[in-house]
Amino acid sequence: MKVGSLVQSRHDPGYHGIVMEIGPEQTRTDHGRRACRVQWFDGDETFEFIKMLEVISEPAS
């Protein structure tokens, strides 16, 4: 998983978003690079544990 990856929630497979940041400053102290910031297609922006997301597509290098 990297910035720009298209992801979906493991708990709600129809819920898609784009990874905006990995290891954001707000979660870095407690969770290091195990969390990311996701911009969901419904307009919400949340912090998620990477293991709770499934990568659908990664951006080309």
Identify the residue ranges that each predicted region occupies:
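Basic/aromatic-rich interaction segments and small domains that mediate binding to polyanionic partners
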Residues: K2-P59
